[in-house]
Amino acid sequence: MSGAPVSRGFRGRRGGADAAAAARVPPGQHVTTDFPVLSAGPTPRTRVEDWSFALQFGGSLLAKWSWAEFQALPQTRITVDIHCVTKWSKLDTEWEGVTVDALLAAAGLDAPPAPFAMPHSDGAYTTNLPLADMLGGKAMVALRYGGQPLAPEHGGPARLLVPHLYFWKSAKWVRRLRFMERDEPGFWESLGYHTYGDPWREQRYEGD
């Protein structure tokens, strides 16, 4: 979107492009130029006319936007590296969407109402996140990838993007963000995946 702020990913120090790229890849990962498609279930095909996004705390609905209303919120473009728990990394991926900070501001919230959040997606997928990992420009609801509307197989029409954690935390087909007083496991976390998922510490599974 024209006029949107742009944040570029780390470009490395002097010493050669290969060395710079290697420094951006967490241990145990390999770089791919493809964009593998991995999902916990079938790919939902949600029409934008039927799409909405909400913020919730307890039994209270804090804010809700239609697709058109969400498109009108401040948009941010970023270029980041992403890292999947299945050991692939993709460098310099370009995304555009609405940061969680902008969502809170649009909802009239000076601060998040609780320290944790659970994104909820079409297909009943969930994952848990500390709010500290979603603020300060660290996370967004992404609507576009590579300058194009986000394809359904990659989470479109909208997915969460939390690029500093393993990519299962970047929930596809996201529809709601539920704030929580206490941390709760999401879909994969309930099946033994790590509750946090830091790729630089190889936190793939519980106990890592």
Sequence positions of predicted segments:
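Structured, non-membrane catalytic/scaffold regions adjacent to prosthetic-group chemistry
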Residues: G3-D208
